Amino acid sequence: MEKHNAPPTGHGRGDQKAEAGRDINGFRVARRDRYDSNRYSESWKRHNVEDDLSWGRMMVGNADWRYWGVYDGHSGWATSSILKEFLHKYVRRKLDKLSAKDLNDSEAIEVAMKSAFIELDDEIVSDGLAAIYEPITHAEAMCRIAPSSCGSCALLALYDPERSIVHIAGAGDSRAVLGRQQDGDNGDWVSIPLSVDHSGSNPDEMARINAEHPGEDRLFSAAGRFLGSEVTRSFGDNRRKWPKEALEDWKNGFFGRVYNTDIQTPPYATALPDVKNIKVEPGDFLILGTDGFWNHVSNEDAVYCVRLWIEAQAKDISEQKRNIQIAAQVTMSKHQGRSRNGICIRITG
């Protein structure tokens, strides 16, 4: 795919055109492992579910790795749909460039995963920005803008079977929790968090953002929202990344909804993930979930539910179903009806 060249920061005049080198008379042919809004827009379906998930296998070096991802979309589904199809491909391409030695180095893998997250987000955001100024149809521009005007968190887990290591990269407030039984079959089960909640309620995130944008005292609300959003890191979200002039042009030309007019030093948000890894032991299981799940269920309760299911495997199937139902009722009834947030969860072991 040809890389789009977005207008420089501060570019905001409708009579100026950004040169992206695309064929505006038809959809161009793109590699299927690279994001291209023109090709991908052909398969978009209208739906109301903003969250998405992915899982599968990918060859890394000579090993058959596994991946699992959850994508918590907001302001629409366009961004999470892009991440479902492309994020693991961007990561795989970065891993393919590593030597055999580096594939055994967790720090090198961390750098590769971070680079893939940033590269895909840059393409999403810059492609939407370029679409405002190119001589294309309004419909095509809207399709290209959508993934950047919507937003999504991303949580991606990779499992290296040769080293029995799982690598977790997260941007946003989705969460990964490992369940592990200590001291053999008779030990207690523990929950091990493998991600960081990137939200306005995280003091470390508040300190980081305030340090990057000194003197801007309206970034966080009293309720802890960051420029109107609960998350501090995400894909897309042009309102927190585009220059002020571009947001005005988007508002005037494409009915864009701009909530914050006090834009001084964008970008404010980033898709840079925190990356963690852990050596997997026999019997471990991994839970990936969006914040809609974790708002209702603690790390410990989630591990407890899966533990009941594991222990029920050797029991009568009717009792197994009963245990699962009881666990779900106990953990969810505390907050029933208090949240309209979407829930997306993946459990693997």
What is the meaning of each model-derived region?
Residues M1-Y67, G73-G349:
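PP2C/PPM-type serine/threonine phosphatase catalytic core
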